[in-house]
Amino acid sequence: MLKLLKVSITGDLSSGKTEACQVFQELGAYVVSADEISHSFLIPHTRIGRRVIDLLGSDVVVDGAFDAQAIAAKVFYNSVLLQGLEAILHPEVCRIIEEQYHQSIQDGNYPLFVAEVPLLYEIHYAKWFDSVILVMANEDIRRERFMKKTGRSSEDFDQRCSRFLNVEEKLAQADVVVENNGTKKELHQKIEEYFYALKGAL
């Protein structure tokens, strides 16, 4: 079977991971998102959905669908519930990422397979990938981006960031570090350079 290079994009909250993935997609890569995958199978009447309800309670379901804000309100200030939710979701996310990888090979039209996995190191999934890109930005810039995009508070930013591994540990493990303290155009140029470097190495 043809082997397609597996690349993961990771980084802290509001560092620019999704923007980087969009550039890869525009350049022809097969791109998947761990967050989008987890949202796609969070359906109340599925096996995974029932496990989530058993953990968090039926009040996280509103009008027949999971309420993201209700889930967040329960887990972000309760580490036991958060760990329980992640134990349910993360294995399924990894399984689907790997299914998508094999699908991308079967399709045969892609130069790279790219997965956005925010908690890549936290769930010990980095070794599955051939290369890891760590997207970084200064904390004050990330905080401003987060608050502007979500309308949430600075305290929410801090609480969500507490889930992430220390940045020094990530720096020690990443294959490539992309700084994203500037404009979108500058980020696009950096990702394009890495895309063509990877293609050239194949």
UniProtKB/Swiss-Prot annotation:
Residues 6-202 form the DPCK domain. Its EC number is 2.7.1.24. ATP binds at S14, S15, G16, K17, T18, E19. SUPFAM superfamilies: P-loop containing nucleoside triphosphate hydrolases (SSF52540). GO terms for biological process: coenzyme A biosynthetic process. It is an enzyme of class 2 (transferase). The keyword Nucleus does not apply. It catalyses: 3'-dephospho-CoA + ATP = ADP + CoA + H(+). Keywords: ATP-binding, Coenzyme A biosynthesis, Cytoplasm, Kinase, Nucleotide-binding, Transferase. One of its GO terms (cellular component) is cytoplasm. Pathway: Cofactor biosynthesis; coenzyme A biosynthesis; CoA from (R)-pantothenate: step 5/5. CDD domains: DPCK. It is found in: Cytoplasm. It comes from the Bacteria. One of its GO terms (molecular function) is ATP binding. Its main location: cytoplasm. Disulfide bonds: none annotated. Catalyzes the phosphorylation of the 3'-hydroxyl group of dephosphocoenzyme A to form coenzyme A. Belongs to the CoaE family. NCBIfam families: dephospho-CoA kinase. PANTHER family: BIFUNCTIONAL COENZYME A SYNTHASE-RELATED, DEPHOSPHO-COA KINASE-RELATED. This is Dephospho-CoA kinase. It comes from Chlamydia pneumoniae (Chlamydophila pneumoniae). The gene is coaE.
